[in-house]
Amino acid sequence: MLIKRRRSWELPENQVTPEHVFLNRRAFLRGSTASIAGASALMVAGCGETSGAAEAAAASEADLTAKAAELFPYPANTSIPVDRPLTDEEVASTYNNFYEFGSHKRIARAAEALVSRPWRIEITGEVEEPFELDIDELIAQMPLEERIYRLRCVEAWSMTVPWSGFPLAALVDLAKPKSTARYLKMQTFMDPSIASGQKQVWYPWPYTEGLTMAEARNELAFMATGVYGKPLGEQFGAPIRLAVPWKYGFKSIKSIVRFEFTGRKPVSFWEEIAPSEYGFWANVNPEVPHPRWSQATEEVLGTGRRVPTLLYNGYEEQVASLYKGLEGQNLFR
């Protein structure tokens, strides 16, 4: 049994969500898991215009997702680092950035085109031996938990989300990188036939992001495979996405298919598009404005309130040491 010590940034989950609400939600999720496959099958059966191959693919996805849902809820080992309540699931699920499917926020419907299971993941680059595995094979080997994190978008809004998944450090250990690996480069899927945004050839698809190895091994770096106590919805970046809460949200790449360990610093998606506005590091700092707007405050989604933004989004104690000696670099853009 994995015994976890409470870190300085953790609070009991019942301080974030009233205990009876949280326990009722978990009981509901346990009882409703079995219904997912049946409901999905009915939805597929009701689409008379769908081809047989598409029906089979949808049924397979529904079955695999239902099996993944049986693992939920994950043990809740962490909580929000400040007194800020969870963002309502409806709000968080209907206000999303996912440029593969469009540049607007109501992306959930378009993102349903993404088939998130089966899903193959490639581990490559400066590792002892490159390999591929299925998302559920990966999940089966990982220490699973739920963490409640802030998410601060570079657009000056924020939400507070209960991610389910595993520490990125566990994936790094599984990959067995060589000593020559200094960075972890991640890429999302590439399929313009379902992702209309990828037909916009002026963007440098596929979406690419990167971390230093020190950042990837930091205790806060997290791979999310679920949210709100169930598998990730497509708009959140199913079936696996990054969550690095001390950085602006565009660093938390979605729907990852490739992890490459490399000795060369990756050029990220937005860095390639507008390097004067978006950089490799992208750490949150209220005193460093975006070239076109202030980062001093943020709108908390669903509340109508603006609050002061905190250095490293409130996670300074856990991550500031990562950047000692790098003061000459553009750490906050």
Feature annotation, model-predicted:
Residues 1-27, 34-42:
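N-terminal secretory signal peptides
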Residues 9-16, 48-75:
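N-terminal leader/transition segments
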Residues 21-27, 38-63:
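N-terminal twin-arginine translocation
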Residues 31-32, 171:
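Generic alpha-helical secondary-structure signal
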